[in-house]
Amino acid sequence: MRYTFYHGTDAKALKMSKEQRDIFRNVCNTVVDYYWNYFNEYRKTRNILSLRKKLTDPKIPYLFESFQNTLKITDKLKAGDKSYELGALYVTNKDYLAVSYSNRAFAFGETGLRAYRFVVAAKKLGIYEDLDGTIKQYADFVYRFGETKEEPVVCTLLDITPSMLLTETGKEVTKDNIMQHQSFRLKEDYELSPTTAMPTWLFARMCDKTKWPPCYR
């Protein structure tokens, strides 16, 4: 049996070649590693909650909470939690989740968002200008990408079979357990085209929102 799945993303990423996306993913991961190490040392010697005041800005809602969440997710990733492993193309069988994912994909999906959140926090804390060399170039690139006007889109993937999928934690998917999950990883590379992506606002308009959970409507 074949199924329809969705991928929420940003057209900025779709306009990049696969090689460019691979390079930028490495850039983002390098920035995440740098700041995770920086703030990990900070947490060993100081109370991370002392940063709350500097990371509170009415123009950037939940800045401190997002920063803290990024630290926790990176902690779990470093500890081997496969739920937070990134790199594969993630898809969902729920249209409302694709809409939600696309609206936070402006910084290059979850990979870029983690790097972007660290860079924004570093700027607010006044430590960004301490960077130099390659890491400064990488952080600048991450910030510019995240600040570029967002273009949320949803891609529809047809004829997907369970054998093409893994669960979020990397387990095999079968026709018997496929309906027990909402988000999946594609095993193979799947080239998405910006010409077949639909602007999120239009995709959402075409969905039956009466079937959406209230918090997504």
Each model region followed by its residue ranges:
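Intrinsically disordered, low-complexity acidic Ser/Thr-rich regulatory segments
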Residues: 53-90, 127-154
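Active-site and NAD+-binding cores of ADP-ribose-processing enzymes
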Residues: 10, 14, 102, 106-217
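Short amphipathic alpha-helices within nucleic acid-binding modules
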Residues: 96-102
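Short HxH-centered metal-ligating active-site micro-motif
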Residues: 92-94
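ADP-ribose/NAD+-binding catalytic cleft of ART/PARP-like enzymes
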Residues: 1-84
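Aromatic side chains
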Residues: 6-7, 90, 101
